Amino acid sequence: MKTKAGFVALIGKPNAGKSTLLNTLLNAHLALVSHKANATRKLMKCIVPFKDKEWYESQIIFLDTPGLHHQEKLLNQCMLSQALKAMGDAELCVFLASVHDDLKGYEEFLSLCQKPHILALSKIDTATHKQVLQKLQEYQQYDSQFLALVPLSAKKSQNLNALLECISQHLSPSAWLFEKDLMSDEKMRDIYKEIIRESLFDFLSDEIPYESDVMIDKFIEEERIDKVYARIIVEKESQKKIVIGKNGVNIKRIGTNARLKMQEVGEKKVFLNLQVIAQKSWSKEEKSLQKLGYIHRRNRD
């Protein structure tokens, strides 16, 4: 069997559809998806197998990154750092741009990325044929910069094989780097954490999801059930009250939604215990971000 393998950084502005694309390619719910922009905070590896036209069995390891953006808050700086590191570590990059975005995001990406890349135009199912053609023509001025320009829709599964074929063509022959059926090397406790965060985005409005995070205090993995004890961290006491809700109605909804998603991903029953705490300025404190896994002591960039 001829094989290829390689790391591919998936880069884009917030809400370009990176996580939706990966979940569709995996046919599983691993990456955090929200209609709110900039939900992804940590890099995640997602492993997609693909047989290309030259009969290579390719193992494409996508690095799902936080959206490219610039803010002074320490948490946001950590998120940008992860995206930049992924670009440096990858063999190839895919820049995902919404058909509705202007070209500024791609131009910023060009100033940051030194690796060969594919430009993918997402959400084409939400635009007219004329709008898609117009956007493709706008990007053609940069045709000397990208390896290929691929219009696609993750929700409608349009042109996804074309994207994978293009990626596979530019990977080097190599033995596979991970086991055959592995979709991610993420620990289950980290996947569960992201599922809880996704539920916060699903049920809470305004700034609260952006000023909150999740700490897994205890994770007990048994044959038939996973037991998860977690804290939702917010910035203010007023936010804590909203997360809990009157008579606990909000926290119950968040918990039930998260637990059902966990059971689907983990393929077993899940016991979930959620607590809510207020910790002022947690997103600006290095010690707090270390505990949450955004900063590593050996590498604080």
UniProtKB/Swiss-Prot annotation:
Residues covered by region (G3): 64-67
Task: Kindly list the positions annotated as binding GTP.
Answer: 12-19, 64-68, 122-125
Q: Which residues form the KH type-2 domain?
A: 204-280
> What Pfam families does the record point to?
KH_2, MMR_HSR1
Which residue ranges does the record annotate as region G5? 152-154
Q: Which residues form the Era-type G domain?
A: 4-173
User: Could you tell me one molecular function GO term of this UniProt entry?
Assistant: rRNA binding
Chief location bin: cytoplasm
One GO cellular component term noted in the UniProt record for this chain: plasma membrane
Residue ranges for the region (G4) are 122-125
* Disulfide-linked positions: none
Location of region: G2: 38-42
For whether the record's keyword set contains Transmembrane helix, the answer is no
Q: Where in the cell is it found?
A: Cytoplasm; Cell inner membrane
Membrane topology field: Peripheral membrane protein
Q: Which GO BP terms sit in this record?
A: ribosomal small subunit assembly
Q: Which UniProt keywords apply?
A: Cell inner membrane, Cell membrane, Cytoplasm, GTP-binding, Membrane, Nucleotide-binding, Ribosome biogenesis, RNA-binding, rRNA-binding
Q: Where is this region: G1?
A: 12-19
* Family under the similarity heading: Belongs to the TRAFAC class TrmE-Era-EngA-EngB-Septin-like GTPase superfamily. Era GTPase family.
What's this protein's function? An essential GTPase that binds both GDP and GTP, with rapid nucleotide exchange. Plays a role in 16S rRNA processing and 30S ribosomal subunit biogenesis and possibly also in cell cycle regulation and energy metabolism.
Q: How does it assemble?
A: Monomer.
HAMAP family listed in its UniProt record = GTPase_Era (MF_00367)
Q: What is this protein called?
A: GTPase Era
